[in-house]
Design a protein with these regions (language model features):
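N-terminal pre-catalytic "stem/leader" segment of glycosyltransferase-like enzymes
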Residues: 1-75
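Short, solvent-exposed loop/turn segments at secondary-structure junctions
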Residues: 8-11, 40-41, 71-74, 100-103, ...
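A generic structural motif
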Residues: 29-35, 91, 186-189
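Extended catalytic core of nucleotide-activated donor transferases of GT-like folds
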Residues: 44-121, 127-131
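Short active-site oxyanion
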Residues: 121-125, 166-169
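Donor nucleotide-sugar binding/catalytic pocket of nucleotide-sugar-dependent glycosyltransferases
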Residues: 123-137, 141-159
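Conserved donor-binding/catalytic core segment of Leloir-type glycosyltransferases
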Residues: 160-190
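Conserved small/polar residues in nucleotide/adenosyl-binding loops
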Residues: 197-200
């Protein structure tokens, strides 16, 4: 069983940056990229779009998991065709990673009804916030297993090993001797209740 994660090419802005960051994080966990391409699919016949989808999912095997990043930047028709093809593989699970409300975007072809129809075809959800889940549930999204990804990790190339003035802040009645950090050049700063009020 493999885990695939979608990434749409030929889009920019926040969607493109976010999808790339999530895809990169997924690859560090061994996920495989499932590449989508933004284009005016209205010019493709259904048969032509089916051929494109066959190429997109060529590496998919039965029982695989696909994490679909929503919004994808594609049209409802394109995404619907993708879900249809994913469902052709026995046991394939679709996890919809819902990062924002597509129908609220000025550049989106989606209506809220389109979103609910598509997302209800997924097996599981990952939401960027609990409020996002509440909104979709209130508007017709089915109750299914889900995760809330409250605080994402952001990939960075910045080395954090050489910070100066390292400090460990504690709020407890304790002795600095209990923290043998002097040999690591880390200062222990203790806050009592009075000191803490100055921080808030």
């Amino acid at each position: 069983m493999s885990v695939h994660i979608t990434k749409t090419y030929n889009i920019g802005g926040l969607i493109g940056l976010r999808q790339n960051a999530v895809k990169n994080a997924g690859e560090t966990l061994g996920f495989k990229e499932m590449s989508l391409f933004k284009f005016p699919d209205a010019y493709d016949s259904d048969d032509e779009l089916h051929v494109r989808m066959d190429g997109i999912i060529a590496s998919l095997c039965p029982e695989d998991i696909v994490i679909f990043q929503h919004p994808s930047g594609e049209s409802p028709r394109y995404d619907g065709f993708l879900f249809e093809h994913l469902r052709r593989y026995h046991g394939t699970k679709i996890v919809a990673f819902i990062q924002e409300i597509a129908s609220d975007r000025d550049d989106s072809e989606y209506s809220l009804r389109d979103e609910i129809t598509l997302l209800n075809r997924a097996d599981m959800f990952i939401f960027a916030s609990a409020a996002l889940r509440d909104y979709y549930i209130a508007n017709g999204l089915k109750e299914k297993p889900y995760l809330i990804q409250n605080i994402p990790d952001y990939m960075t190339d910045i080395c954090a090993n050489e910070h100066k003035n390292k400090k460990l802040y504690i709020m407890a009645e304790t002795s600095q001797n209990e923290y043998p950090l002097n040999n690591l050049n880390i200062e222990v700063v203790q806050y009592d209740a009075v000191s803490y009020t100055h921080l808030t």
